[in-house]
Swiss-Prot record:
Function: Ferredoxins are iron-sulfur proteins that transfer electrons in a wide variety of metabolic reactions. Mediates alternative electron partitioning in conditions of acceptor limitation at photosystem I.
Name of the protein this chain belongs to: Ferredoxin C 2, chloroplastic
GO molecular function: 2 iron, 2 sulfur cluster binding; electron transfer activity; metal ion binding
SS bond partners: none
Gene encoding the protein: FDC2
Length: 181
C-alpha cells in the first residue's frame, strides 16, 4: 500500500533544489509504525485506529526572534517539528541544516517543555541549561522560546575545545603540506 505522506528528509532536499523523483513513503503496511522513504530513511508513521481518528494535541508556541525583533505565536501539534509547522504557517525562523546537526535554529526555552530526541547539534549539558533546536523539536506543552545567535551557542558548546589562543602562520609547514619545497 502506498501512503502519500511527505518525508521530511526528502522534502528538505527538494527545498534545496536537490533532484529527487518522489517525496513519499511507499512501503507502508497497515498497522505498521515505521516505514522508509525512497532514500531508505526510517520514518515514524502514525495512522488512525479502526475505532476512529487519532487526535493529536496542539500547543501554543511563542518564539521571540531576537535578530529580527519580532514575536511569533502559532499552534504546533505534538507530532510535528516546530520549525516545519512554523513554515507551513508562513512564519520565517532561522535554520540551516534542518536535521538537528548545527546550531542555526537554537533557542533558549523560557517556559514550557519540548522533546528533541534527534538534536545531535546540541550537547546534553546545553539541553539541561534550557537550549533546544527548533528543527527537531516537538512541543509537549505550551512553549515560549527565544532565538539565540548561532555563534553564541556554538561557542558555548565547542569554544572551550578550540579556543587555545591565536593561530600562528607557519609558511614552511604550509609549503611542506602543499608539496612545494
Amino acid at each position: 500500500m502506498a501512503l502519500i505522506l511527505p518525508c521530511t528528509f526528502c522534502t528538505s532536499l527538494q527545498k534545496k533544489n536537490f533532484p529527487i523523483n518522489r517525496r513519499y513513503i511507499t512501503n507502508f503496511r497497515r498497522g505498521a509504525t515505521t516505514a522508509t522513504c525512497e532514500f531508505r530513511i526510517p520514518v515514524e508513521v502514525s495512522t488512525p485506529s479502526d475505532r476512529g481518528s487519532l487526535v493529536v494535541p496542539s500547543h501554543k508556541v511563542t518564539v521571540h526572534d531576537r535578530q529580527r525583533g519580532v514575536v511569533h505565536e502559532f499552534e504546533v501539534p505534538e507530532d510535528q517539528y516546530i520549525l516545519h509547522s512554523a513554515e507551513s504557517q508562513n512564519i520565517s525562523l532561522p535554520f540551516a541544516c534542518r536535521h538537528g546537526c548545527c546550531t542555526s535554529c537554537a533557542v533558549r526555552v523560557k517556559s514550557g517543555e519540548l522533546r528533541q530526541p534527534q538534536a545531535l547539534g546540541i550537547s546534553a549539558e546545553l539541553k539541561s541549561q534550557g537550549y533546544a533546536l527548533l528543527c527537531v523539536g516537538f512541543p509537549t506543552s505550551d512553549l515560549e522560546v527565544e532565538t539565540q545567535d548561532e555563534d553564541e551557542v556554538y561557542w558555548l558548546q565547542f569554544g572551550r575545545y578550540f579556543a587555545r589562543g591565536p593561530i600562528e602562520r607557519d609558511d614552511y609547514a604550509l609549503e611542506l603540506a602543499m608539496g612545494d619545497e
